């Protein structure tokens, strides 16, 4: 639908240079995540963005495989994508897909928060954790290719997000990996915050949602600067916004629609229908046969 809408508007004034990119937010999991031990494992978020039709095909295939591996966790359907599946898919799609570390629900931000206290209390152990984070980033750069994996910062006044943003900036410098700024948009406009809150509470009434999702809407550059400049400085924030253009420049215009391709089925027109029926009736599944002749 997004591509159809774009196709109908792309020639209008104000749409010059606009691009639509499609992707998927997946659960990127280790292979010990199963229905049996699902309560002892997390389902970390990860972002995939298709830069062209071939990349979109790869993401679709990966999503199909994840659904085959699905299971219920609490009241939610979980569809894990294993690291090995991502590796296998990306082996054929380098340059077609961009990856991003995602929100606080991602594997890297979660690990940074999980061991935050060690930074002050046990520097030696924290150094090992920090190295594992650098290794994870290097692993992603290897899978996606140089310049196709990004660290994702997000605007927020929450202490957890501010801490993670600072650490991602440090990782960016130490691993030579570009960072971007996104808003993890769950709703369109700031005025929609209350509606979004009511929607979430209708599903999980005891869940605190207001503060966590207060900044997860589509912001202007000015709004992002208002949220982030005091913590990181104008130039750092502007660089994160400018880096999103690295993805824009890689993205191609593509369509998902195809021309109707009716297969050619050769028929022996010399054989009457009755002869054909007797010849093939045993190959018709009983369920189909019953449906055909129930009247």
Residue ranges and their predicted role:
Residues 1-295:
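Phosphodiester-processing cores and adjacent nucleic acid-binding clamps
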């Amino acid at each position: 639908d997004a591509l159809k809408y774009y196709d109908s508007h792309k020639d209008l004034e104000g749409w010059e240079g606009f691009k639509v990119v499609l992707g998927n937010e997946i659960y990127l999991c280790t292979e010990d995540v199963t229905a049996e031990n699902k309560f002892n494992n997390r389902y970390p978020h990860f972002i995939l963005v298709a830069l062209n039709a071939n990349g979109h095909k790869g993401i679709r295939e990966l999503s199909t495989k994840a659904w085959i591996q699905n299971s219920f966790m609490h009241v939610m359907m979980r569809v894990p994508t294993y690291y090995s599946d991502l590796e296998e898919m990306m082996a054929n799609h380098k340059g077609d897909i961009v990856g991003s570390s995602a929100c606080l629900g991602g594997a890297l931000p979660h690990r940074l928060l999980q061991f935050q206290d060690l930074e002050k209390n046990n520097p030696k152990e924290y150094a090992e954790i920090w190295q594992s984070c650098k290794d994870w980033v290097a692993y992603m750069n290897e899978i996606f290719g140089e310049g196709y994996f990004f660290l994702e910062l997000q605007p927020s006044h929450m202490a957890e997000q501010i801490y993670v943003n600072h650490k991602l900036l440090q990782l960016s410098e130490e691993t030579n990996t570009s960072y971007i700024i996104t808003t993890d948009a769950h709703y369109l406009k700031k005025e929609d915050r209350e509606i979004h809150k009511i929607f979430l509470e209708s599903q999980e009434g005891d869940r605190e949602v207001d503060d966590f999702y207060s900044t997860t809407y589509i912001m202007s550059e000015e709004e992002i600067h208002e949220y982030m400049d005091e913590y990181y400085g104008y130039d750092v924030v502007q660089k994160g916004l400018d880096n999103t253009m690295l993805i824009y420049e890689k993205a191609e215009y593509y369509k998902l629609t195809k021309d109707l391709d009716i297969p050619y089925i050769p028929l022996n027109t010399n054989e009457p229908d009755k002869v054909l029926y007797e010849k093939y009736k045993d190959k018709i599944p009983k369920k189909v046969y019953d449906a055909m002749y129930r009247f």
